[in-house]
């Protein structure tokens, strides 16, 4: 209960906290896992992964450094070792990034994504993204350099707080389609060349076709989902020229279509709500068709109990 006792108690507390922090760092530094990843990349890609020896040496050197610091902190209770922990963590993360991002399959430089705060911007599983139009969102289309930290770039941010999403990157990697508040737009990956492509009714969820035309969803039919008493309009697949002209409806389904994407064989994969031949009513089947809308048929999911819904085909 005196000053000396209080000082001793503080010392024990600080030692306990230091030991806990060091143990957390030690648990996060999984060197065997990184060695396994390096061995897999080296054996799998061989000449396409030329820095294997360099990374092995760096891992060995880091392991010695980490063991020395952990010993000093946990056995000798060296305060300097605790101070060095943040730098050790940064070195570990840099080593992980270098080893894993040298994967030859990661042969691109930037990641394109939608950044959204507050709300995920998700609908119920039977609805289309037209249900998001008119709602307030704090979101933008952005990109960052895969191999550089803190290098985020805003490509498009709407002037008003409205939905932006449904991004589809062009084959050349220089432009993209996206939807915002019922309009399909196109913009360059550098943020230039913004233009409206489809402005008819509620249009969203676009997809480039190899011949230059565009697929997209539209509720132009003005029919609605029957099991919610017509409370949600149905979006079906439509086709248009690159400039938005020549719009033609391809699907005439009772309920929504979603997420068109081009398969390697040139056909279009998409999802469709289906009441027929269904094991239960949560039914988003994968369908495929020719780009002109012909030969629509099931791809996967008819009479399959699990998974009961498929998203983002």
Where are these regions (language model features)?
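Alpha-solenoid helical-repeat scaffolds
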Residues: 121, 137-139, 145-189, 198, ...
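Beta-propeller blade signature
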Residues: 139-145, 186-190, 232-244, 283-294
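Long amphipathic alpha-helical scaffold segments
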Residues: 2-20, 46-154, 161
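Multi-bladed beta-propeller domains
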Residues: 149-162, 188-202, 241-255, 290-309
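Conserved beta-propeller blade repeats
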Residues: 111, 161-171, 176, 202-213, ...
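Glycine- and acidic/polar-rich repeat regions and solenoidal domains
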Residues: 268-280, 284-286, 293-313
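Asp-box/WD-like beta-propeller blade repeats and closely related beta-sheet repeat scaffolds
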Residues: 183-239, 243-258
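Short, conserved, GDST-rich strand-edge loop motifs in beta-rich repeat architectures
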Residues: 113-136, 216-233, 270-284
């Amino acid at each position: 209960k005196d000053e000396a006792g209080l000082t001793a108690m503080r010392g024990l507390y600080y030692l306990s906290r230091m030991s806990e922090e060091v143990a957390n760092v030690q648990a996060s530094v999984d060197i065997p896992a990184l060695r396994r990843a390096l061995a897999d990349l080296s054996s799998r890609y061989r000449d396409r992964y030329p820095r294997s020896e360099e990374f092995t040496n760096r891992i060995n050197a880091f392991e010695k450094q980490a063991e020395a610091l952990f010993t000093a902190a946990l056995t000798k209770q060296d305060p300097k070792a605790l101070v060095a922990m943040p730098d050790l963590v940064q070195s570990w993360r840099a080593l992980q990034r270098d080893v894993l991002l040298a994967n030859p399959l990661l042969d691109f430089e930037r990641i394109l994504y939608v950044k959204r705060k507050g709300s995920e911007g998700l609908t119920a599983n039977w609805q289309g993204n037209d249900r998001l139009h008119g709602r307030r969102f704090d979101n933008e289309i952005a990109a960052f350099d895969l191999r550089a930290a803190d290098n985020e770039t805003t490509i498009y941010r709407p002037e008003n707080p409205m939905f932006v999403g449904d991004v589809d990157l062009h084959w050349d990697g220089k432009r993209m389609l996206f939807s915002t508040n019922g309009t399909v737009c196109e913009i360059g990956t550098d943020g230039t060349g913004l233009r409206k492509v489809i402005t008819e009714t509620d249009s969203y969820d676009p997809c480039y076709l190899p011949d230059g035309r565009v697929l997209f969803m539209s509720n132009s039919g003005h029919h609605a989902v029957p099991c919610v008493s017509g409370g949600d309009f149905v979006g079906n697949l439509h086709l248009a020229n690159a400039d938005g002209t020549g719009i033609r409806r391809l699907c005439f389904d009772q309920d929504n279509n979603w997420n068109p994407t081009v398969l390697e064989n040139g056909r279009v994969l998409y999802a469709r709500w289906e009441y027929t031949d269904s094991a239960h009513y949560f039914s988003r089947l994968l369908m495929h068709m020719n780009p002109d809308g012909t030969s629509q048929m099931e791809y996967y999911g008819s009479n399959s109990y699990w998974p009961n819904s498929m998203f983002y085909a």
